[in-house]
Amino acid sequence: MSDITGTAFPQVAPGGVPDWSAMKAEDLLAYREAENRRRSSPQARAITGEPDPGATIEWQEVALPDRDLPVRVYRPVGADRADLPLVLHVHGGGFVGTAVQCDWVNSHLAAQLPALVVSVEHRLLAPDTPLSAAAADGWDALQHMLQHAAQWGIDPARTAVFGESCGALISALSAIRARDAGLHLRAQVLVNPAVDVTETMFDHASITQHADTPTLAVPQLRLFHRLAVPPGADARALSPLYADDLNGLAPALVVLPTDDPVADHGRRYAERLQAAGTPVRLAEYPETGHAFLSMPGLVPQAKAAGAEILEFLREALTA
């Protein structure tokens, strides 16, 4: 999903917003390029927040067997250590988005935990890259980091995953795969998670209650769904909400803005985690919308949520 605001677009619906239902592939690519330039601009910092000066930020590439995967790396200033905890982050924005939009929270976590925070610049949804490709990016990055822990200066025994929106879906899937592979994660943080991409995605009550919010609307979700699960894709396998077994997963913090179309996705997932015996904390932030964590300049509650995430990870990664 995406926190889309204020970018001109060639096809607009009444009210001046993008006409998601009429969007063609070439239109989406043009919009994506323009929107990600805006999110990466210095001017956007007034909304997305200033990075913590206690962390360095740089782009690197993870060399996977079949592709090079860009990642944005946040490291504590002066941390010449080989045993930092790892927080693997996956940004939101199903078909629009960039790790840069999360510099504020990720740099703060890196500086204050301290930890190495790595944000995966996953393949955004498009006709040729469905959700399964982005999910593979998240999982492959996690495996690579743990297999090359010395190269990255991390302690693989102190690892957490952290995702926002569709990035939370990717992080939740990675947590499930990690358990199945015998990898022990310390924590998972899921912020406004969209964890159902089956046909029931639109049946949750919050979809109707918050169908047209400034940062996410149902027409966007329908476009997301069309790109995420093309004909022949296994939507259930990509939906953590319907995973067969949620027992034995890393303890979870689920952060929910209440005024969000997918708020009930997070509520139902927290209920399923609890029923399965996985420790879970559900933190709801009243009168906040989708993607609020990436907008501390506009939404004061973002800083409170960031502080809660910091304390949750600090407890998990230092125990």
What residue ranges belong to the model's regions?
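Hydrolase active-site cap/lid region
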Residues: I176-G232
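Short beta-strand/loop motif that positions the catalytic acidic residue
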Residues: V254-L256
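Short beta-strand element of the alpha/beta-hydrolase
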Residues: D83-G93
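Catalytic active-site module of serine/aspartate enzymes centered on a nucleophile-bearing elbow/loop
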Residues: V299-A319
